[in-house]
Structures are given as structure tokens and as C-alpha cells.
Amino acid sequence: MNILIVGLGYAGNRFLRAFLHLDEQGYLDEPLKLAYVNRTKRKHTLQYYSSLSEALGAFDPQIVVVSVNDENHADILLQLRGYSGHVVCEKPLVNANNDLEATFDALSSISGFSFDLIERYSLISTSLKNFIEEKGLKLLRGNFYWGKDRINDRRPTCGATSEIIHALDLMQWLCPNEGHFKLQDVSGVISDYSVSGNDVLDTVAISSRLGNAVVTGYSSFVNIVRQRTLDLVFASSSGELVYAHMIFDTPNWDEDNLRVWKRLAGGNEIELMTISTDENRFGTALHTIYKLVQLCSDVLDQVYRQYPPSISSADLTTAVSLQRQLNEIERRA
């Protein structure tokens, strides 16, 4: 199984760690062979290629991981025209000034696509999604807060749209039967916080609707602490209000918590579900990449074992739909 990583920076090295971990665990019956494309050769024993075209011809990968900087996604994806393997792509798909339709068309020959929205792979996410479906809950209200500190970060970025995508996706993925997402109001802040320029979107607040449900949210790259929360209010089939509170990566990476409850007329609360993934993985091979390993194993299952995508998988159609939403947010911010 040949896997090509395009861009061996921060994100690319995370993917490398995830696939190497699965290989060391003997996840497949055959070894994984990894190679990379990068502007410069790194201190790795992996096969290095200076160009994507050279790598596609010489290495013949079954999986291509696109983990270059945001601004270079479109260029790499366009170079994959005619490629017939499986593509794994970091978010966002492209930037607002790229030709989205041309990018989508360039990927018409691929056998599969996996978008890196790893919060879907958390136990709290899949558990809540199944609970919503089993209980027939209807979303009334959603709110999110999604931020972290990227001030003076050396990694280039397209801005806060790269952060808000996680919350936008989770809301729609958790509640797929509510209807279409419609953006109503947007407020944004542009600053020189990033090495990418003097006018990069650092913060955005939105109000929107998902079907008839109101969804509000705030996302920022100038949050001084990592803060990733979703709050949801549902109506049950009997008319009771059901509340869900999700916290991701707090206090450490991959430590997620979910609480679901209902409140009675007298104010008393009844716990319906509590889930915590607070195992401390600091110092282990899975530190900061536990959910990413789940995504990578899903990809290997699809490509090697020909399994259908898991419930958590985000496909190309999802990536394009989210990109259209991000483009509108950036245009109106």
C-alpha cells in the first residue's frame, strides 16, 4: 500500500505519525510504504520527490494526502486531474479566491475522498449523532465557540474560515435531517496577526439557520486559549427539551466531553448521557493524533479492504458544500 504525503510540514507530519502508528500496529496484512513531496528534502528515510507529477509516476500511490498550506491546496488538487486513487485532504478544500468548480472537476477520476474533519471521529460525536437519530430529536437551537491562538504562528493560513469549518460541519453532520444551512448575518475582524499578510480574517461571528433551527457561533484565531464547544437544544417527540453540551480537546488534545440532559418543569435535571474521552496520552505515540488515527484507519479500510466509508467520513460533496459556505462567510465578513 503506497501512500504519498504532499507537504511534510505540521499537518503532513501528523498524518505521517498516524500512518506509521497503524503500520507499526500491523493494521493491514501488508506494510505501508510512505513517500513525500516537499519543496525541500527533510531528514527522513522516506522516499522524497520534488514534484507531484514525478511522485505520481514513479511511486504510483493508492492514497495521496494533501497537507500543504491552505493557499496551495487548489494548485495541488488541480495537478491530481486524472488520478484514480483515494485523496485525503486537509481543510479547507481551497481558498475563497480559487476556482472551486475547476477544482471539483479536476477530481472527477478519483476513487474516493476523505476530508480531514477529525472531530467527527470522536466518541462523543458519533455517540451524540446516534442518540439524536434513535430518539428522533429535532434541533431548535445551536451555538458554538471555536477558537485558538494563531498569533505570530509561523504557519500560513487563509484565516478564521479554516477554524469555523469544524463547527459548521459538526452542526450539519449531527443533524442531517434539519434542512439546508442558510447564512443570515456575519461580522468579521481582519488584522495582521498572521504571517500570511496584513489583512487576514482573524475572527468571525455568524447567525444562521439550519432548516428552522437558529444557529449562532463565534470562531477566532486570536483566542488566547484553545476553546472548542458546541451547545444544542432539541425537542423530543413528546415535546420535552433536551440539551447537549460538547467540549473538544480540553484540557488536552483528544480529551473530549459530552453531557446530554433534560430539564423538568420544576427545574430538576435528568442526565441522559455523559461520555468522556479524558485519557491522558501525553508522551505516547497517540499524543495529539488519536482522532486522526481513526480517520486514517477509515481511509485504509476503504482503500485496502474495500469497506464503505464509516459514519464519520466526510466526502468530496461535503467538502465542496462547506467551501461554498466558507466563501460566503469570507465575502460578507
Residue ranges and their predicted role:
Residues M1-H44, A58-F59:
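N-terminal Rossmann-like dinucleotide-binding module
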